[in-house]
Amino acid sequence: MEPVADRELQAKLYLERHRIMELLNQLTSFLLFARPKKPREYLISLLERLRVAKATHVAFPYFMDNSNTVSMFEMMDMAGRGCISFVQYKEALKNLGLCTADEVLNDDGHIITLDTFRDEMNKRMEKMWSMF
């Protein structure tokens, strides 16, 4: 019989290889964002949409539509200037699970507009979902 430590290591490697924890974190983030009345059906729907997108090589579905993105941006842009700070931008990406804690994002001094925010979110979402 295998030692417990060996089985634990095998389990850990399996989860890492298949990126299961990242997938669960993303699904949880979207579940908490949407707060559907039927969470199980919602999660099944998300996974099915991802499976179809991957199998048919079509674009991955965006789980936050434009109105959600605009609302999030407007909450951060409380002064209505049409831009947010780099710190706000980075925190939003972290909160959505689109930026890892150890990822280094460099502030290039440019302002973050709604278009920049939306484009970067969509790019990161597509990249993230394509890994699963």
From Swiss-Prot:
Organism field: Mus musculus (Mouse)
Protein name: EF-hand calcium-binding domain-containing protein 10
InterPro entries assigned to the protein according to its UniProt record, in alphabetical order: DD_EFCAB10, EF-hand-dom_pair, EF_EFCAB10_C, EF_hand_dom, EFC10
UniProtKB keywords: Repeat
MF GO annotations: calcium ion binding
Source domain of life: Eukaryota
Sequence ranges assigned to domain EF-hand in this UniProt record: 64-99, 120-132
A Pfam family: EF_EFCAB10_C
Transmembrane spans: none
SUPFAM superfamilies: Dimerization-anchoring domain of cAMP-dependent PK regulatory subunit, EF-hand
